[in-house]
């Protein structure tokens, strides 16, 4: 018999993303880009396997897998059908500013710089940028 507490915990998990798997054009560049960022967001490396890596935070994880050669030619573009961007919470505008400076030091392409940090609107504080495959990434402050 399942206890009330087990059922309660299961219901809290309902709807939470279990994992996201992203195919990438160059796994080595992807690892270099994402490792520091995800570490700063609290993720840890969960698995490393031939052709891929996963990072875990609590009960969710993100997997990056090397795209097979035969599928590399088409490339990715966020305006095509499919994923547009990934957005992650940070706590405050101070963190958005810190990440922005770190990204610039790494020569990462910051999007919408003319509207930064309010590209999402006057009451919305975030930094938008691209990973090595030009997947748009957003870090949004929970508090402004």
Annotate each language-model stretch with its function.
Residues 8-31, 86, 143:
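N-terminal beta-strand motif that seeds the catalytic metal site of vicinal oxygen chelate
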Residues 31-32, 97, 137:
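Alpha-helical elements of the RecA-like P-loop NTPase motor core of helicases
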Residues 17-25, 76-144:
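Vicinal oxygen chelate
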Residues 21-68:
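Core segments of cupin and vicinal oxygen chelate
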Residues 66-70, 141-144:
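Acetyl-CoA-dependent GNAT
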Residues 70-76:
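Short beta-strand/turn micro-motifs at beta-sheet edges
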Residues 1-7:
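Hydrophobic alpha-helical signal peptides and transmembrane signal-/tail-anchor segments
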């Amino acid at each position: 018999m399942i206890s009330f507490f087990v059922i309660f915990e299961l219901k809290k998990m309902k709807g939470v993303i279990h994992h996201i798997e992203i195919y990438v054009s160059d796994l080595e560049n992807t690892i270099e880009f994402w490792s520091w960022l995800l570490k700063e967001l609290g993720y840890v490396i969960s698995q490393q396997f031939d052709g891929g890596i996963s990072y875990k935070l609590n009960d969710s994880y993100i997997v990056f897998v090397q795209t097979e050669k035969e599928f590399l030619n088409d490339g990715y573009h966020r305006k095509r059908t499919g994923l547009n961007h990934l957005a992650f919470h940070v706590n405050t505008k101070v963190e958005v500013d810190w990440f922005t400076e770190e990204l610039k030091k790494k020569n990462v392409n910051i999007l919408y710089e003319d509207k930064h940090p309010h590209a999402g609107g006057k009451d919305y504080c975030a930094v938008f940028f691209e990973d090595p495959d030009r997947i748009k990434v957003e870090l949004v402050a929970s508090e402004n």
